C-alpha cells in the first residue's frame, strides 16, 4: 500500500503533467497564457502537498535557533578581546615609579566580529537591573576577593565602599552583604584551595540551596604551599565532578537532559577566576620567587586544561581570564607581580556581566 507521501507525489504528477501536456499544444501560440496556467497549477499542487512535508515554519525556527546558539558561542569566545591604554598620570613622579603613577583604561577591540556582539560596559543602573534579586557567591583566594570588591564598587557609591573595603579585606575571612536597594546578596567565601571549593559546592547540593551566580578560583596558594601541579590537577577534577552534579547539562554541550545525580533546580551561572600573570622578579618574598616560577605556572595551567573544568574544554565553568587581562595591562598595572590594579578586576567583572547578558538572552 502506497503511503500518503507517495500518493501525494503521484497525484501531483497527474494534476500537473496531464493538464500541462494537454494545454501545451493549444496554448503554444500564447506563451504568456501557457506559463500563467502552469504557474497556477504548480501553486495549487504545492498547497495540496504542504501537509505532507515538515512545516516551513518549524524548519526556519530550527535554523534560527542554531544560528542564535552559534552567535552566542562566538560572542562568549570574544569577550576577552580587549585593549589597554596605560599612560602616565598627571602626578607622575620619577622618584616613585610604580603602578599608581599610571592611568589605566580598557575597551573591547573594534574588529567587526567583536562589534557585532555589542558588548557594553554596564553602568551602575544597568548592573543593578541585571543582578536585581540575585544571590551571588564569590569564593577563592585574594583574586576572588578583588573580583568581589570590583563588583560591589560598581553597584555602590564610594561612600558606602569605604567601610565595606575594610571589612572585605580582613585577613582570611568570609564576608556577606545585602544590597537592599536591589535585593542582591553577595557572599565572599575565603577558599584558597580547590578542596575548599569542592566542599562549598557539595554544601549547596546537600542543602538544596543554590546561588544564581557562582564565581570561584584557586591555584596561587596551592602553588606556593604545595608546589605540586599533578596534585592540583586531581583536586580540579574532583571539583569538576562536584559542579557537574549540580548542573543540568545544556543542549549546547551535547545532551538533552541532566546528568546522573543532578537536581531539578534552576542552575547557577558558574565562572572560574583564572590565575594572573606572575612577574617573578616582582614577587615580594623569596619563597614566592623560588616556587612560583614561569615553569611551575605553565604546569598548573596544563592541569587546568586537562581537568576539563572549563567551558572551552567541555566543562561547566566559563573562564574569567585574569592571565590575559593582566598580561595585556602589563608590568605597570601591578606592584607585587601577583595582585593587579583595580581596572584589571573591573574588566573581569564587566566581562562576567556581559556573559550573563548573553547566556540569559537579555539586552539592556
Residue ranges: model-predicted function:
Residues 1-364:
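A compositional signature for long Ser/Thr(±Pro)-rich, low-complexity
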Amino acid at each position: 500500500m502506497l503511503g500518503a507521501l507517495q500518493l501525494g507525489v503521484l497525484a501531483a504528477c497527474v494534476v500537473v503533467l496531464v493538464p500541462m501536456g494537454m494545454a501545451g499544444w493549444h496554448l503554444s501560440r500564447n506563451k504568456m497564457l501557457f506559463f500563467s496556467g502552469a504557474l497556477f497549477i504548480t501553486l495549487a499542487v504545492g498547497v495540496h502537498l504542504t501537509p505532507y512535508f515538515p512545516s516551513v515554519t518549524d524548519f526556519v525556527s530550527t535554523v534560527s535557533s542554531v544560528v542564535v546558539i552559534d552567535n552566542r558561542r562566538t560572542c562568549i569566545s570574544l569577550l576577552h578581546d580587549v585593549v589597554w591604554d596605560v599612560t602616565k598620570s598627571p602626578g607622575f613622579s620619577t622618584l616613585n615609579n610604580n603602578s599608581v603613577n599610571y592611568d589605566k583604561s580598557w575597551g573591547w577591540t573594534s574588529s567587526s566580529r567583536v562589534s557585532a556582539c555589542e558588548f557594553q560596559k554596564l553602568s551602575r543602573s544597568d548592573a543593578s537591573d541585571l543582578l536585581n534579586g540575585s544571590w551571588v557567591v564569590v569564593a577563592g583566594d585574594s583574586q576572588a576577593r578583588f573580583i568581589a570588591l570590583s563588583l560591589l564598587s560598581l553597584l555602590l557609591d564610594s561612600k558606602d565602599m569605604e567601610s565595606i573595603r575594610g571589612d572585605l579585606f580582613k585577613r582570611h575571612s568570609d564576608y556577606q552583604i545585602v544590597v537592599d536597594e536591589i535585593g542582591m546578596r553577595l557572599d565572599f567565601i575565603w577558599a584558597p584551595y580547590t578542596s575548599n571549593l569542592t566542599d562549598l559546592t557539595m554544601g549547596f547540593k546537600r542543602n538544596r540551596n543554590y546561588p544564581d551566580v557562582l564565581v570561584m578560583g584557586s591555584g596561587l596558594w596551592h602553588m606556593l604551599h604545595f608546589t605540586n601541579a599533578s596534585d592540583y590537577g586531581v583536586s580540579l577534577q574532583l571539583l569538576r565532578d562536584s559542579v557537574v552534579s549540580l548542573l543540568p547539562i545544556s543542549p549546547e554541550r551535547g545532551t538533552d537532559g541532566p546528568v546522573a545525580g543532578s537536581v531539578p533546580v534552576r542552575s547557577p551561572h558558574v565562572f572560574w577566576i583564572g590565575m594572573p600573570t606572575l612577574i617573578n622578579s616582582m614577587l615580594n618574598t623569596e619563597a614566592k620567587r623560588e616556587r612560583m616560577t614561569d615553569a611551575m605556572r605553565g604546569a598548573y595551567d596544563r592541569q587546568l586544561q586537562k581537568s576539563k573544568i572549563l567551558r572551552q574544554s567541555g566543562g561547566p565553568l566559563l573562564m574569567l581570564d585574569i592571565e590575559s587581562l593582566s598580561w595585556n595591562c602589563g608590568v605597570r598595572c601591578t606592584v607585587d607581580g601577583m595582585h593587579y590594579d583595580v581596572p584589571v578586576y573591573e574588566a573581569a567583572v564587566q566581562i562576567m556581566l556581559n556573559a550573563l547578558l548573553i547566556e540569559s538572552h537579555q539586552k539592556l
